[in-house]
């Protein structure tokens, strides 16, 4: 059997463990959790996280037979064809928008800076973290996490939402030193280090073939949008939670997909979520409060949440907000 063909599922956001489980169920048919662990070789403590992720992604289904829960794979074409259709629709829409927006606009030089050497990259990361007013979204390897640990803990105590993705080089002892209010996920494989603060400034930390570190610093809105998209699909989505949003009942936010993740965490625990938001509706900015009644997520296309206020129910999205009534600028979530 050509093993490499299954690794191609990584492009759909599956981790290596998720691929092993999905492959096992595709090849061997429906099984209970004990048999899946035995046949796939995944660690027992991770099994239910992986099942939940695969169910959420529409790749497996479960049913109760007696006292046992049985899992089965959704056929490949059924499970993945809608992702391909949605991505093609998104690309068509994006291409159309780019052509329309650039038709009559003057060319601007993007605000992009090259940062050379690890020390300067860390200094700029520290600046962005301490200057944040609402949220910091980032992925870090062990070495830089150790350097930024104190600052991240301080900002979490200050009420800034910190959403962190770690990699396999980070052990439980280091994770245990993080403030419990920090949202932590772990990715099975190493990826780029990214930092986005308040959805307005960002850093991409890279390493070239000669192992000389360099970083790219952005303040250009369109490039931040692309970096955010890359972070969600390549780093955040394939990762699993260690600590979710529910350790704190109040979260500052400025990113639509992070808001949807937080609301999902709260509602999974049976909590009611209210919000005080600054929104952009057309050319006007408005303050609105209400209850977030629902979220709607189509990976690669939209992250929408619905705010029920005295004036009615409105849909809220991210930067483009092409399917929603309003665009999120910033705000605070409260859950109870």
PLM feature spans:
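N-terminal accessory interaction module
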Residues: 253-336
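Surface loops and adjacent helix of pleckstrin homology
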Residues: 65, 74, 141, 167, ...
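Flexible, charged surface loops at secondary-structure boundaries
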Residues: 127-133, 177-178, 196-197, 266-272
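Basic, Lys/Arg-rich alpha-helical nucleic-acid-recognition elements, primarily the DNA-binding modules
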Residues: 1-80
């Amino acid at each position: 059997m050509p093993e490499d063909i299954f690794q191609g599922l990584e492009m759909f956001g599956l981790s290596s463990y998720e691929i092993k489980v999905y492959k096992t169920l595709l090849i061997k048919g429906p099984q209970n959790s004990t048999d899946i662990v035995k046949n796939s070789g995944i660690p027992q403590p991770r099994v239910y996280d992986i099942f939940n992720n695969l169910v959420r992604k529409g790749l497996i289904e479960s049913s109760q037979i007696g006292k046992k829960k049985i899992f089965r794979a959704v056929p490949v074409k059924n499970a993945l064809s809608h992702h391909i259709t949605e991505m093609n629709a998104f690309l068509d829409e994006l291409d159309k928008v780019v052509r329309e927006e650039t038709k009559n606009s003057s060319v601007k030089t993007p605000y992009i800076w090259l940062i050379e050497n690890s020390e300067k990259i860390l200094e700029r990361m520290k600046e962005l973290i301490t200057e944040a007013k609402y949220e910091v979204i980032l992925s870090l390897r062990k070495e830089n996490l150790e350097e930024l640990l104190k600052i991240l803990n301080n900002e979490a105590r200050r009420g800034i939402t910190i959403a962190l993705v770690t990699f396999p080089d980070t052990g439980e002892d280091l994770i245990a030193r993080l403030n419990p209010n920090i949202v932590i996920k772990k990715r099975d494989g190493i990826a780029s280090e990214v930092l986005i603060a308040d959805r307005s400034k960002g850093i991409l930390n890279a390493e070239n073939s000669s192992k000389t570190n360099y970083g790219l610093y952005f303040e250009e809105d369109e490039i931040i949008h692309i970096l955010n998209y890359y972070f969600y699909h390549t780093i955040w989505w394939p990762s699993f939670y260690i600590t979710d949003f529910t350790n704190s009942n109040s979260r500052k936010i400025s990113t639509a997909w992070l808001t949807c993740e937080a609301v999902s965490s709260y509602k999974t625990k049976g909590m009611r979520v209210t919000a005080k938001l600054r929104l952009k509706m057309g050319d006007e900015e408005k303050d609105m409060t209400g209850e977030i009644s629902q979220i709607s997520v189509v990976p690669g296309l939209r992250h929408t949440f619905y705010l029920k206020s005295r004036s009615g129910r409105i849909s809220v999205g991210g930067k483009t907000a092409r399917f929603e009534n309003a665009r999120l600028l910033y705000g605070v979530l409260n859950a109870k």
